[in-house]
Structures are given as structure tokens and as C-alpha cells.
Design a protein with these regions (language model features):
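Flexible beta->alpha loop and helix N-cap segments adjacent to enzyme active/binding sites
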Residues: 17-18, 22-209
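Phosphate/ATP-binding catalytic cores across multiple sugar-kinase/actin-like superfamilies
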Residues: 1-9, 202-209
Length: 209
């Protein structure tokens, strides 16, 4: 940025799955610099990049492909017997201390669970992290991530100049003591901010909760 004067910076590669370093970069860049991190920035994203490169180099088209979400995985169906549940029903289950699994539509591309293949739990439970880590067979110090509605993100987290964090690529300082399950030892949390047009069903669930 200093050498080129460029105000638009795009970052990619497996290194940029490191949320701590991403936040460091965000905090130390000038405020007028726009940043974008490719959310599928590991090896699995190379095929997408090569396909786009080939498209633009061979077809010479100016057509753009805006990134609306990263639910590019296979759409699967499971035949199970049960009753349909509303966002209100699921919110009640969470408030009662239950772990809820979400399995809907296409799976997420990349390593982050963003509401289509996710485990949910009440972040207000001070023992929530231990409970989920035990359930997943992980070390007890492993942090949990949080999803927050876009319009309320600044109330709960220090967004350090970011307008949004839809792909869970930053660790942000927690501003409230009401969500201990997602508050790591350094007072940060890996955050997904959520808009309705990104994932309508997941948005409605979080809003109801």
C-alpha cells in the first residue's frame, strides 16, 4: 500500500485463514483502504480462481460474478420423520440449553460453518465452550465462534473499522460480558455477521433467538 498508493487490497491464500493476523492487518492499514479477503482462500479455492481466469482470458467477457454467498457445496436431502419447526421453536430449544444442529440446502465452501452445516448453542452459558468442545472431541481451550445480525454487530463487537464479517475471517474484541461461551481468553471472538439476503433461514433463527 505504501509503495503503490493502492486503496483497494484483495488478499488470498491459506495464510489468510488466520483470523488473528487478518485483524492485525485490518487495524494497521490506513482507514481509507478497502480490503477484501477471498473467503475460499485455501487450496480448495484454486479451482474457482482458475475457472474465472480461463473465462476472462479466453472469452474476453466483461461479465461480473458478484459473490453473494459461498454455499457452493452439494445440496443434500435426508429422509427423516419429524415435525416441521419454526425459528421460534429452535430459539426456544437453544434458550433451554440444547445443542442444535443445522443441515439445510447446500454446504459451505471453505472451512467455516456459516449456518448451513452448523452446531448452535446459547452463548450466554459460561460452560458452553467446555460443553461444545467435549461434544466435538476437541481440546477444552478451543474457542467457539459467534454469529450476530449485521445490524447489531457494533453493539456486541469492536468491528475495528469493518462494516461486516460475513465469512468469519476476523477475531474481534467482545464488548459485552453476556456471551461468555464465545469470549476467548484474550477477550476476542471469531465473528460471522449475518444479513438476511445472505442466508434467510439462518437470519430468521438468529433474529428470533
Amino acid at each position: 500500500v505504501e509503495k503503490t498508493g493502492c486503496k483497494n487490497v484483495c488478499m488470498s491464500g491459506g495464510y489468510f485463514l488466520n483470523c488473528v493476523s487478518n485483524t492485525f492487518v485490518q487495524k494497521h492499514l490506513p482507514k481509507d483502504v478497502n480490503t477484501f479477503i477471498e473467503p475460499i482462500c485455501g487450496d480448495d479455492g484454486i479451482s474457482i480462481g482458475l475457472a474465472k481466469l480461463n473465462y476472462y482470458s479466453k472469452i474476453l467477457s466483461r461479465r461480473k460474478f458478484p459473490l453473494k454467498d459461498i454455499y457452493f457445496g452439494k445440496k443434500q436431502k435426508i429422509n427423516i420423520k419429524g415435525n416441521k419447526v419454526s425459528p421460534k421453536d429452535v430459539a426456544k430449544l437453544l434458550s433451554d440449553g440444547n445443542v442444535v444442529g443445522i443441515f439445510q440446502s447446500r454446504s459451505e465452501s471453505g472451512p467455516r460453518a456459516l449456518g448451513n452445516r452448523s452446531l448452535l448453542y446459547d452463548p450466554r452459558d459460561p460452560y458452553g465452550r467446555d460443553k461444545i468442545n467435549k461434544l466435538k472431541g476437541r481440546e477444552n481451550y478451543r474457542p467457539l465462534a459467534a454469529t450476530v445480525l449485521q445490524e447489531h454487530a457494533h453493539k456486541w463487537f469492536d468491528m475495528c473499522g469493518l462494516e461486516e464479517s460475513p465469512y468469519m475471517l476476523y477475531t474481534l474484541d467482545v464488548l459485552s460480558d453476556k456471551v461468555p461461551a464465545v469470549n476467548h481468553v484474550d477477550n476476542t471472538c471469531r465473528v460471522q455477521t449475518l444479513k438476511k439476503n445472505f442466508n434467510k433461514h439462518y437470519y430468521n433463527l438468529i433474529k428470533e433467538f
